[in-house]
């Protein structure tokens, strides 16, 4: 696969590639999404500060795991994955690379993740 697409891309309307898988792993390690793929109270609080949470009053069925085609690990899909991707683009935390599905975190996006204890590290680096 193309290096840029493998690093970060959109999969339908959510984040994929190393960026999507890495962010998902950090969400799970920090207890923002539980082992049953449900958003936790801590996850709700963080995502509310980002303006991400969809309008539903229930957090049931917000998160769907999606197997990443290049990384062979899960990334976040479903309404929550879509909302995260949409907000990251609209706030300038994520940018598309040309007319492709390839994306990368902007410096502002990296700072937001670091501030939340979700250091993007290697998975968020631009190529």
Q: Each predicted region: which residue ranges?
A:
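Long, charged, low-complexity, helical-prone intrinsically disordered regions
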Residues: 1-127
């Amino acid at each position: 696969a193309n290096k840029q697409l493998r690093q970060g891309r959109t999969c339908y309307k959510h984040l994929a590639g190393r960026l999507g898988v890495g962010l998902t792993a950090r969400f799970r390690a920090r207890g923002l999404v539980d082992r049953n793929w449900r958003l936790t109270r801590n996850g709700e609080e963080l995502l509310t500060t980002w303006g991400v949470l969809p309008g539903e009053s229930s957090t049931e069925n917000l998160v769907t795991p999606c197997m990443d085609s290049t990384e062979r690990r899960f990334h976040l899909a479903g309404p929550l994955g879509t909302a995260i991707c949409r907000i990251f683009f609209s706030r300038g935390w994520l940018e598309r690379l040309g007319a492709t599905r390839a994306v990368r975190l902007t410096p502002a996006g990296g700072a937001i993740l670091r501030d939340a204890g979700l250091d993007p590290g290697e998975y968020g680096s631009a190529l």
